[in-house]
Amino acid sequence: MVEADHPGKLFIGGLNRETNEKMLKAVFGKHGPISEVLLIKDRTSKSRGFAFITFENPADAKNAAKDMNGKSLHGKAIKVEQAQKPSFQSGGRRRPPASSRNRSPSGSLRSARGSRGGTRGWLPSHEGHLDDGGYTPDLKMSYSRGLIPVKRGPSSRSGGPPPKKSAPSAVARSNSWMGSQGPMSQRRENYGVPPRRATISSWRNDRMSTRHDGYATNDGNHPSCQETRDYAPPSRGYAYRDNGHSNRDEHSSRGYRNHRSSRETRDYAPPSRGHAYRDYGHSRRDESYSRGYRNRRSSRETREYAPPSRGHGYRDYGHSRRHESYSRGYRNHPSSRETRDYAPPHRDYAYRDYGHSSWDEHSSRGYSYHDGYGEALGRDHSEHLSGSSYRDALQRYGTSHGAPPARGPRMSYGGSTCHAYSNTRDRYGRSWESYSSCGDFHYCDREHVCRKDQRNPPSLGRVLPDPREACGSSSYVASIVDGGESRSEKGDSSRY
């Protein structure tokens, strides 16, 4: 509902941008005395094309509206009508007339200046809180741009721009700057070292596990939880020395492994006596090399092989575990029986079984694709088992594949001798040597602890398979371990 504003107030629209207050007063002053001329301007003090003129006599205002409406002024047709109040302001709050206090000293002419068409610093006679937009003509021309800044609050009374307008603009600028800086910092964080390092390490583990663990992917990556419980860690007497070796091995193998269980460093404790300690040092070194080619080492394999407490029996019993490790190296799912069957016997032989087993198992896992490591490590341990010292073994780490190790005094146990440690030395040299010795030492396991093997050790031609038949041969050795005697290879490949 539109109400007429002050009867003597006219709205003049469609003005030329060059028309100023003096021109308006000169043109409309012909119809009667003018109390006020209000030209609406923008922030640059340029005319926005409309103005308000207040006549002292309302009758003069009506005559001027009839006479000047639709006529051309400075090249543009203008509209002259009675100023109207906005519909949403009808019956609303009213302020006392402000024209008297805002009128210029001459009392005749004043130009209201403000941003967005608002009449800041000057208010009309009746609706003081409304500016140019508060007075719309009968044509209902929209001046909403003038209404918005004026309704902000009492700041429109003052002559300057309202603080509520400047403050949000500053905040907006700061927010926009921060928003532009935000993505940069985020992008900078996205290229941080830890994420890239995790990506590379995970890629490396995936590639390594699929390439080097082709025969035992499930065994290396996902061991059964039953096998983790089978063999308890050794007594605390070995704990301190164990940490020294485990730290060294962990650092050497961390380049290819992502998750090393804390129990590995704890469970492979070196023995308390000198001779077995040297042996166990070898097994840890081998473990570190071979573990580099596997993705995850299960904690069960670390717990299974407790360090020996006595020297010579530890070697002997290691051979039986050695064959089991060969078989397990190529089997996807080792049964829990395989770890439980070879539970340590009485204390005299308990740790002997598990002394070289860690060395054997790891070397069997790594030798198929990395002959350099498997060869050198196998040679070291075969020499060490045959009686050479730890230092001699270390001197032969860099030897070629074809060079046989130095033959030390052959070790005997219960009358059976250890043979064929240096008989064959091809790409798979160390593993085939251990096969040849399995005929002698394997029979000192859980069922034949101290029984001397009466049979001759199997010949290399019979025991050694073709290198292309690595899977079958490993199953063959696993069958030897499970049954306690030599069996035929056929049918054992079904374990895969």
Swiss-Prot record:
SMART domains on file: RRM (SM00360)
Feature: compositional bias, Basic and acidic residues: 204-214, 242-253, 276-289, 313-326, 335-349, 484-496
GO molecular function: identical protein binding; RNA binding
A single GO BP: RNA splicing
Region spans: Disordered: 80-349, 452-496
Biased composition (Polar residues): 175-184
Low complexity composition bias: residue spans: 97-114, 149-159
UniProt keyword annotations, A-Z: Activator, mRNA processing, mRNA splicing, Nucleus, RNA-binding
Subcellular localization(s) per the UniProt record: Nucleus
Primary localisation category: nucleus
Pfam families, per the entry: RBM1CTR, RRM_1
Tissue: Testis-specific.
InterPro entries given in the database record: Nucleotide-bd_a/b_plait_sf (IPR012677), RBD_domain_sf (IPR035979), RBM (IPR050441), RBM1CTR (IPR012604), RRM_dom (IPR000504)
All copies of domain RRM, residue ranges: 8-85
Protein origin, superkingdom: Eukaryota
GO cellular-component term (any): protein-containing complex
Function: RNA-binding protein involved in pre-mRNA splicing. Required for sperm development. Acts additively with TRA2B to promote exon 7 inclusion of the survival motor neuron SMN. Binds non-specifically to mRNAs.
Other notes: The RBMY1 proteins are encoded by repeated regions of the Y chromosome, mostly within the AZFb region. The exact number of functional copies is unclear and may vary between individuals, and some of them may represent pseudogenes. The proteins are very similar, which makes the characterization of each protein difficult. Thus, most experiments do not discriminate between the different members. One can therefore suppose that reported interactions with a RBMY1 protein involve all the proteins.
Subunit structure of this chain's protein: Interacts with splicing factor proteins SFRS3/SRP20, TRA2B/SFRS10, KHDRBS1/SAM68 and KHDRBS3.
The protein's name in its UniProt record: RNA-binding motif protein, Y chromosome, family 1 member C
Organism of provenance: Homo sapiens
Gene name of this polypeptide: RBMY1C
